[in-house]
């Protein structure tokens, strides 16, 4: 992942539950980023503990596959959890038209085929999404967003 970060300070084995700011001290990105990582670690671990390695809500579970008469595969809308991390698909989408398309073509022909949901995080910069640039400050990029990508 790319970004201009001071340092990575999050270590799960320290068992910190938060980072507290002190008055009159310098505010640095490492403290903020560690708090974000602590919260994410707790959220993902809690979800994995309660849901299991993967799963979805009873109503609204996403990523179900349907095949039409012509053999076209559609990935269903909804939410699913992969290793405790939330993955969302806002609308039904053709297998071949996913936001992060697969490198190869889907299998063709009759028979059994294996499908699985793969998810990952990636940084999104102002180059990727100009709306995250801070125009009120003259246009610098003040942050990097983290996007959860997926592919079936």
What label would you give each PLM region?
Residues 2-21, 69-152:
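Beta-strand-rich solenoidal segments
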Residues 1-74, 79-82:
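N-terminal-proximal low-complexity accessory segments that begin disordered
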């Amino acid at each position: 992942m790319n970004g201009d970060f001071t340092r990575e300070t999050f270590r799960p084995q320290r068992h910190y539950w938060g980072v507290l700011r002190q008055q009159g001290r310098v505010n640095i990105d490492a403290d903020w980023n560690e708090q974000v990582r602590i919260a994410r670690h707790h959220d993902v671990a809690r979800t994995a503990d309660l849901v299991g390695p993967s799963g979805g809500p009873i109503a609204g579970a996403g990523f179900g596959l349907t095949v039409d008469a012509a053999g076209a595969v559609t990935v269903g809308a909804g939410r699913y959890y992969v290793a405790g991390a939330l993955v969302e698909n806002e609308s039904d989408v053709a297998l071949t038209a996913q936001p992060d398309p697969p490198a190869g073509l889907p299998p063709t022909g009759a028979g059994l085929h294996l499908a699985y949901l793969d998810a990952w995080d990636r940084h999104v910069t102002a180059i990727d999404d100009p709306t995250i640039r801070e125009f009120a400050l003259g246009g610098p990029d003040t942050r990097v967003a983290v996007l959860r990508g997926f592919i079936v």
